[in-house]
């Protein structure tokens, strides 16, 4: 007869159970937006001197979040008294030049005494005196250059300039 059928060389078995793979789940679900708190502050101040001759104006603002931190400050100093003190009034005076000459009249009268025939002429002014002109000293004031300072701390790095 017939020979029994030979068993196959490879035997198949039922599929094994699927293993469970897990990754570390995020702390924040991606379906819900993150509402991170932010802390802010701002302040402004103007300090004036007596008679409003000078003032210092300051303004500052900060914003802090878990991810970043920002700080801005603006300080301005003004002193209009310096501007007026530097520009002193200038007084200039020059005496007028003498242009008229005076000559005394000649004596023509005769006396019993000897006759005077000489004429007298007053000296003519040759030079006029002019006072020196006061000159201003050239002092120029300009605004202070803008200064910016920035700091950043995050992602393992800190920068400042």
From Swiss-Prot:
InterPro entries: Cuticle_C1. GO terms for molecular function: structural constituent of cuticle. Sequence repeats lie at residues 6-9, 14-17, 35-38, 87-90, 103-106, 112-115, 121-124, 130-133, 143-146. Pfam families: Cuticle_3 (PF11018). Coiled coil: none annotated. The keyword Transcription does not apply. Keywords: Cuticle, Repeat. The keyword Repeat applies. PANTHER family: LARVAL/PUPAL CUTICLE PROTEIN H1C-LIKE PROTEIN-RELATED, PUPAL CUTICLE PROTEIN C1B-LIKE PROTEIN. Component of the cuticle of the pupa of Tenebrio molitor. The tetrapeptide (A-A-P-[AV]) repeats found throughout the protein are also present in many proteins constituting the protective envelope of other species. This is Pupal cuticle protein C1B. It comes from Tenebrio molitor (Yellow mealworm beetle).
């Amino acid at each position: 007869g017939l020979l029994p059928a030979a068993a196959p060389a490879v035997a198949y078995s039922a599929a094994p159970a699927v293993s469970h793979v897990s990754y570390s789940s995020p702390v924040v679900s991606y379906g819900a937006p993150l509402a991170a708190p932010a802390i802010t502050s701002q302040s402004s101040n103007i300090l004036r001197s007596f008679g409003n001759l000078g003032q210092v104006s300051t303004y500052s603002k900060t914003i802090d979040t878990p991810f970043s931190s920002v700080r801005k400050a603006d300080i301005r100093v003004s002193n209009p008294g310096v501007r007026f003190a530097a520009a002193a009034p200038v007084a200039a005076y020059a005496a007028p030049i003498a242009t008229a000459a005076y000559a005394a009249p000649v004596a023509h009268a005769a006396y019993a005494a000897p006759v005077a025939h000489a004429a007298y002429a007053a000296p003519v002014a040759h030079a006029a005196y002019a006072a020196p002109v006061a000159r201003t000293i050239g002092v120029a004031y300009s605004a202070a250059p803008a200064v910016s300072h920035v700091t950043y701390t995050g992602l393992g790095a800190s920068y400042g300039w």
